[in-house]
Amino acid sequence: MILERIVTDNLPDLERRKMRLPLAKLQELVLDIPYPPIDMAMKLKGRQVRLIAEVKKASPSKGIIRSDFDPVDIAGIYARNGASAISVLTEEHHFMGSLDNLKKIRESGVASKLPLLRKDFIHDPYQVYESRLYGADAILLIVAMLSPERLQELLSLSHKLGMKCLVEVHTRSELEIALESNARIIGLNNRDLHTFKIDLTVTERLRPLIPPECIVVSESGIQTRADISRLEELGVDAVLVGEALTASVDIAAKMRELL
């Protein structure tokens, strides 16, 4: 299973980071951050569907998506062309991301008014704290890889630190767990993380089950304006798009096409 392999492959890296920067010291550094996170929920509300544009170099299914990959340059293009938030993949082994990319984007100022979402396979409170330290305003939590108890723990910690959570589901049972945890930003992933197959009807099936007070984000497999129009008709608030943008020769032109 791809999801399980990704989590396993990253465990040694997490342990090394804990050795280099112990949790107690990490917590001190986070508490000293002078500025609050940007509210991603506020950025995703509106009459028109919002775009979360993803900084993504590679994926397990496609390999390297963009060889001339400059995360700061890409984030700047997103910020100038209508993105409401920027997702930054930080998983190293399968997506060729890094926490340093997140930090560089935040410190560069190219997207100073947009929330940054750390997209990774987060399962440990340590990762929540380090997300804040490296400049994230929000984090991804994947229900498929978390117990209900751990999901609630990570949600509570994130909110304590002022960060929002995009809680990702793929099935009805996962959605029920997310709603029971009082998640307010629900990501409907059209990709099965166990097989990496795409099915856009996932959003169609699950969207009617989500109460109106939640913000709904459709993720994965979104390639065209027609895809977004279809999702808009289903009542989603935002879409998360990665490969369709980073694979484009002209990212700005692709954004104009989608929006």
Swiss-Prot record:
InterPro entries in the cross-refs: Aldolase_TIM, Indole-3-glycerol_P_synth, Indole-3-glycerol_P_synth_dom, Indole-3-GlycerolPSynthase_CS, RibuloseP-bd_barrel
Entry EC number(s): 4.1.1.48
Record gene name:
trpC
One Pfam assignment: IGPS
Q: What protein name does the entry list?
A: Indole-3-glycerol phosphate synthase
State the organism named in the record. Dehalococcoides mccartyi (strain CBDB1)
Give the classification, highest ranks: Bacteria, Bacillati, Chloroflexota, Dehalococcoidia, Dehalococcoidales
Its annotated pathway reads: Amino-acid biosynthesis; L-tryptophan biosynthesis; L-tryptophan from chorismate: step 4/5
Recorded hits in CDD domains, A to Z, give:
IGPS
UniProt entry tagged with the keyword RNA-binding? no
Family membership noted in the UniProt record: Belongs to the TrpC family.
Q: Which UniProt keywords apply?
A: Amino-acid biosynthesis, Aromatic amino acid biosynthesis, Decarboxylase, Lyase, Tryptophan biosynthesis
User: Kind of enzyme, top EC level?
Assistant: lyase
Reactions it catalyzes? 1-(2-carboxyphenylamino)-1-deoxy-D-ribulose 5-phosphate + H(+) = (1S,2R)-1-C-(indol-3-yl)glycerol 3-phosphate + CO2 + H2O
Q: Which GO terms describe its molecular function?
A: indole-3-glycerol-phosphate synthase activity; phosphoribosylanthranilate isomerase activity
Q: What biological-process GO terms show up in the record?
A: L-tryptophan biosynthetic process
